[in-house]
Amino acid sequence: MKFSKSLLVLIPIIILIFSVNTQSQDQDIEEVIVYGKAIKESQQAAIEAKRSAPNLAEVISADAIGRFPDVNLSDSLGRLPGISIERDQGQARYVSFRGTPKRYTTTAFNGINIPGVENGRIPRFDSYPTVITSQVVANKAITSDMPGESISGFINIKTFKPSDVDGWSFATEVGRGEQDQGGGDITKENIRTSYSNDDFGFVVYGSSSTVEQITDNREPTYGGTKGAQTPDRIDFRSYKVERESEAFGGTFEKYLQNGGRIFLTSLNTEFTDNEERNDFRVYVSDGTPTTGSGYTGSARRLFNDATYINKTEMLTLGVETPIGEWDVEAQVSKIDTTFDTYMPIGYFIGGGQLTNLSYDISDPQNPIVNFDGTYRDVDYPVKLLVDAIGGLYTETDQFKFDISRENSRGQLKFGFQYDDRVATGGGATLATISVSGGYPADVCNPKDYRLGDFATPRNNDVGAFYTDNPALNECLNTVRPPRSDFPDDEKINIEETLMAAYIMQTFDMEWGNIIAGLRIEDTEYQTVGFRLATVSGDIGYENIAAGAKEELSVKRTYTNYLPSVHLNYDLAEDKKLRLSYSTGISRPSYIESRAAASINSISESIAGGNPFLKE
């Protein structure tokens, strides 16, 4: 199903609504009432939305978000009870409910499901700025009108509507800060303006934020046995990070005389992580636990100027209107996501260069290592240039239809959703390709780009230092081949079709209500790639890396029936008891089920997908 075909489905619905709408008679306006909306009222509306929700949910308003210096929605959601956030270098990225795996959480904008950018399933929230949100509903109990993959939680991000404020409105925010370590800048700017009258309305917004920081890592890797662990490797790493987040979009609405609306919404977000890494590694053989001295060790060095891009683009055409006694919602969406990594790595390998080596790792966060000289004196006989690349690019056409009405028992609601997804890319999670000719040290000598020692309060007796990686990268671009492409056996080629239908009935009682429903999801999944042909003898890294490949195509179809029941009992005017039973489905991610494998020449490891995984 392509976007144009989805549009053809929606156009007759819009024409029907216009034909019904034109039958309404114009009415004279006899009175104009102007309403103001205070911050307290906005927060009270969020509280009331939580109380009246048919399921267990947490609701946070835009005004509540604005009281805190949150850069993205992960920080904001982390303030809600029962929700935890996972961080990367101190910054919030993933969201999970009640300690469950983050893959059990799904996300949507205005009810439109967004595929996980990194792997098609798991959503990231660090690219979603707070300015776009009018209200965030974190559903902790899942009803049948929510995606089946929402096992532990479903987060619906509601963006601003033009009709939220009559006439013109304008909002802006500017923030500045500074990191304690390294003095990195923190900036935040956003702007939003809207206009609406009785006939039409529009809202447009833009947002940008940056975070600069230095991340100081010490990472010992252990061997040996429990209680007698010895260090195999000790890493001294420093990252100079600049993260940028940009978003822009808007909504145009045409209001119908029957109270409905036709709307076009655009949402575009982009998160860019620019990361300089300087990584010095000490290797020890046959060491002793905790402390040791008198060893001869080996050194390796990695340095790079990497770029990670995380992008979501969504365009939705929809209609909401009453038709007779029914409330009808229909939406067709085009959703594109991009996850791209480019990391050209200078990888220098030595052996036995570190003499009179001693170490003390009693504090793993601050290991102490000494040897004759410092890292500025170390030379490396092997100098490689490695392209670490990864990417997942998805295109989704989605059609969603929901209809509901009141009946003698309460409310009846049912709907249908169709998703057609294509995922391409490669190098999951990273492909490493050694650039022909190795590292051109005669032209781009790293010694010519040395800077000062690590800015760190920790021990740095080894003399780990910074390199001007961006300038060094510019030099490399003048002499090296262009960015490597994904190897054929690491390319991702996936097509997936999801069809879902649901029905749910709310039974109103004197003491509360019961909501019972059934959701049926049908999945068709196909992946094309390569697998390793049979290799005789030792199946080691070298054999696999050089082994013959053969084409593999796998197609699977399965159907899941997902019932749910929710009970809401009013114990008192300000107390409610909620009991829920729901079922869900955890599909393998595109990375886990791809017909491809990635070979890492740095760690000498292989990671591959399994297209025969079951849901």
Language model: regions and residue ranges:
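N-terminal periplasmic accessory domains that precede
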Residues: 73-76, 93-96, 108, 123-125, ...
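Short acidic/polar hinge/loop motifs at secondary-structure boundaries
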Residues: 85, 96, 112-140, 191
